């Protein structure tokens, strides 16, 4: 999710190489989760909770879901219930995989990971509240493209 990469860029100094490495790691985790039980999202979330005190489900529940739904529905017309379930599942999976990679690969401290999660929630709130200023997901993607040279292929047509 570009929002997570944007937060890492703004607040933790991640550049192109680290963002791409994180994205690849998350994709590898997703592929491995298909065949390895210890790589399933629920297993990794339990590891984060028990070993590091990071309760991903609790953190996801703190995300202002109504705001996230409105942001998402600006470009994706789905029913509220479909959108809510999709976003909840996506946010849970992404946050679990990202936090696992940030801890194990990038050696971020628990404090830094908790800050990342809080900043992620704050960015969602900002996107929702300040829509009148034109801060949108495609603009976040454009910022990553311009400043970090990271391009999310989902936004190529939107940006051009």
Predicted regions and their residues:
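Intrinsic disorder/low-complexity detector
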Residues: 1-8, 37-104, 133-160
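Amphipathic alpha-helical segments that form the core helices of the histone-fold
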Residues: 22-33, 114-127
């Amino acid at each position: 999710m570009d929002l997570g990469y944007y937060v890492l860029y703004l607040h933790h100094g991640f550049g192109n190489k680290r963002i791409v490495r994180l994205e690849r790691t998350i994709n590898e985790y997703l592929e491995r989760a298909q065949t390895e039980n210890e790589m399933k999202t629920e297993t990794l979330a339990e590891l984060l909770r028990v070993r590091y005190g990071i309760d991903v489900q609790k953190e996801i529940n703190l995300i202002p879901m109504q705001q996230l739904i409105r942001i998402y529905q600006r470009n994706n017309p789905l029913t509220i219930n479909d959108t809510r379930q999709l976003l909840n599942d996506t946010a849970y999976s992404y946050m679990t995989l990202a936090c696992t990679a940030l801890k194990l690969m990038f050696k971020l401290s628990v404090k830094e990971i908790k800050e990342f999660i809080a900043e992620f929630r704050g960015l969602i709130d900002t996107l929702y509240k300040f829509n009148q200023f034109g801060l949108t997901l495609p603009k976040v993607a454009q910022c990553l493209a311009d400043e970090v040279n990271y391009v999310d292929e989902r936004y190529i047509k939107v940006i051009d």
